[in-house]
Amino acid sequence: MEKKTGRLEAFSDGIFAVAITLLAIEIGIKEYQGATNQNLWQKIVENWPEYFTYFNSFATVLLIWMGHNKILNKIWKPSHSIILLNDLVLLLVVLFPFPTKTVGAFIGTNAVNTVVSFYAGFTGMITVSMLLLNLGILRDKKIIINPGKNLPWFHNMIRGQIIGIIVYAFAAIIAFYSAFIALALTFGMWVFWAIATKDTDDEMED
């Protein structure tokens, strides 16, 4: 069977590139009156929570792309439902700069708990969309390349995504008590995804 995911992969990669570009565009310090060499350094240092948020979001989008790329590499062709589920993933990914910018703007204010909860919840929604994509593929197993080898991979990925959804939901709740712990959980999750999406020796040989 001929593999027919090229156009979908190219379109998806373009959306991921747009999302990462939008994240980077938001980083910076606005011009202000009375700027000097000394107070500019102070402004740069004071904005560290914003830099952390953008770094965290970049790593998250990068690892989502890695997992997404592996998913499309393991199917022959996308069905109509798979294309729609893939579009849901892309919609949420390209909107990810919105919660990221919101956290960067309000992390040092009295609204920090709400904004971090929103950020964690939105990241969890992206994970839900990835889970739905994987479940959609498992409903149509004939599109999976080498099912004997790749079905266990999908099952492992689904288990990881369920864990991720639980952690993000917990982070969204705990944010109202400790925004720092909630952000630390989102940071820990991209470390988790870095391990979960790592190629096995067999996959690297393909």
PLM regions and their residue ranges:
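Multi-pass alpha-helical transmembrane bundle typical of ion/small-solute transporters
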Residues: 1-206
